[in-house]
Amino acid sequence: MARGQARAAERQANNGLGKEIEKKLWAAADKLRGSMDAAEYKHVVLGLIFLKYISDAFEARREQLLAEADEGADPEDPDEYRSENVFWVPPEARWSHLLGSAKLPSIGKTVDAAMDAIERENESLRDVLPKGYSRPSLPAVQLGRLVDEVSNIGLHEERHRKLDLLGRVYEYFLGQFASAEGKKGGEFYTPASVVRVLVEMLAPYRGRVYDPCCGSGGMFVQSERFVEEHSHRIGDPARRGQPGDISIFGQESNRTTWNLARMNLALRGIDANLGRQNADTFHNDLHRDLKADYILANPPFNISDWGGERLRDDWRWQFGAPPVGNANYA
């Protein structure tokens, strides 16, 4: 009884810490509301969170390598980081460099240069990260304050990793931005409660998981969480073919949202095939030969202009062609 109460108390304390951090970051981000709309500053904030997290992870790994230098470890070798699923962060992209420039009028250009450097050094992030931090509509003073606020949180600290802090902040911001954007926000975000129910209903222990309209990747994140809660880890070679061995496949038509998903999964170390480009599943199926074991999706409902007249003889309509004027049954 005492042990259960202690665990409950710890969960409550962690939940309080997580909410405190979420609200603090949101308050800082919300100061940008007057200079740009939610659709724009969403990428400003999420990009900074991404940059802070990979920089923290890099520095943690760097400290390990410095401690092991006498044993042959090389803290300047990018492969020493990539072998541990840590992104290599060049000096001009490290958070300490950004923080040192936060009060300068050129902070926007500094952040843009950091994003470019990260993409150059990490092939999996090529053309993924947001740019435009030096745009006139983003005041340098407000951007600098946001950098300061993000700096106060060690996104790679042990206690924050246990909280899945990055995931919580990312999901919280996606939800907040979706609310701010109204109906349009539903295009990239499905409420976490809905995602959790869908995943727990299907219980994807093993096999291929597919989302044909994956948005920002919430279904995949929750699938990983489900597997981990059952004591396994996605991508563990030792469990290939066993419970816990699942593969992720997805597709997204909106390029901006597709990049959000790639960032979301990259931060969590989830290996996924989201196609070589963003594409409409109806008219450019990038996984035509995929035999999925689980299909999880929250498709865009009540779309009338989906080009159904061009797909009347599509091979996928094995149970009858859907109405041309409504994609709900497609």
Located regions from the model:
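Non-catalytic, mostly N-terminal accessory regions of nucleic-acid modification and defense proteins
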Residues: 1-206, 273-286
